């Protein structure tokens, strides 16, 4: 039986009449990479703060067998939380950053970080503010890769970086860090760049989980049809969740409709994660 890393039942967070996170029930198994995707203010960070024991919450929540609200000290022995690269202390030298992380995280392996940095051109005596974007990413990776955590939580980790450096970050995360004994949670709104590394996905809108699925199943559920002229009425009868016009033709997106039936309406194609996200957030169903 697969070990469960996070188990939430009715997890919610409100500020007066404002529901930052509506009652949510979900679980995250060991050895998965979960993408938590939503617009700014959707509730992603609120959920993470509850998981990390950084804020109070309503409902039930267990993270690696611990209650984050009462056992945060024990929990953080096995958890690493990294926000975007802009959070690296710019006034510190690279070597001082390693000193700092070594002092605050019990599972940080300085020797491993040095081994990683020695393969780069990042100078230990240079202040973070003087590093190029590429060097900043390398330092960020050195910190992430060198913390032996069972749960790695990344909140918009590549915010503000150019696409080349964003891709470099995620490639290294997948190739050099992740294995079946670790679980990774990534929040982002840059959907296309993490699609290839995810095993599971969760969409959040206005504090509510509107979709939760394994990636393999998700890409089977959603199909787009470029409707053959004259078949628009039949296409509407099947209940598309989203409609549009492409090259003068009606396009419809369907969820959980047999592909053979849809093929009778026109040309079909499977959707990427970004298209599924947009259809789910803006669609009719």
Each predicted region: which residue ranges?
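C-terminal coupling/interaction segments
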Residues: 242-285
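ABC transporter nucleotide-binding domain
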Residues: 168-254
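The feature captures the beta-strand-to-loop junction immediately N-terminal to the Walker
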Residues: 34-39
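ABC-family P-loop ATPase nucleotide-binding domains
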Residues: 83-139
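Conserved ABC transporter NBD signature motif
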Residues: 59-70, 74-75
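Catalytic Walker B motif of ABC-type/P-loop ATPase nucleotide-binding domains
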Residues: 152-156, 161
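Helix-to-loop junction immediately C-terminal to a conserved catalytic motif
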Residues: 52
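Conserved structural motif at the start of ABC-family nucleotide-binding domains
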Residues: 6, 21-23, 76
């Amino acid at each position: 039986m697969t070990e469960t890393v996070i188990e939430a039942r009715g997890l919610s967070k409100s500020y007066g009449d404002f529901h930052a996170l509506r009652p949510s029930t979900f679980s995250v198994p060991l050895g998965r990479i979960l993408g938590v995707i939503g617009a700014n203010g959707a509730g992603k960070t609120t959920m993470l703060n509850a998981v990390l024991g950084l804020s109070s919450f309503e409902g039930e929540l267990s993270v690696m067998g611990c209650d984050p609200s009462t056992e945060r000290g024990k929990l953080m022995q096995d958890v690493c939380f990294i926000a975007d690269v802009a959070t690296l202390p710019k006034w510190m030298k690279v070597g001082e950053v390693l000193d700092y992380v070594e002092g605050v995280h019990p599972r940080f392996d300085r020797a491993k970080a040095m081994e990683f940095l020695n393969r780069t051109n990042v100078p230990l005596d240079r202040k973070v503010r003087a590093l190029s974007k590429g060097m900043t990413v390398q330092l960020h990776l050195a910190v992430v890769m060198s913390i032996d955590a069972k749960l790695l939580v990344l909140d918009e980790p590549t915010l503000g970086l150019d696409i080349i450096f964003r891709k470099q970050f995620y490639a290294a995360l997948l190739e050099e860090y992740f294995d079946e004994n670790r679980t990774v949670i990534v929040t982002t709104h840059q959907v296309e760049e993490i699609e290839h590394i995810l095993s599971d996905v969760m969409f959040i809108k206005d504090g509510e989980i509107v979709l939760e699925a394994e990636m393999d199943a998700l890409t089977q559920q959603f199909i787009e049809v470029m409707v053959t002229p004259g078949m628009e009425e039949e296409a509407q009868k099947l209940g598309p969740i989203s409609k549009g016009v492409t090259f003068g033709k009606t396009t419809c997106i369907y969820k959980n409709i047999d592909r053979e039936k849809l093929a009778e309406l026109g040309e079909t194609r499977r959707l990427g994660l970004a298209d599924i996200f947009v259809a789910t957030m803006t669609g009719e169903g």
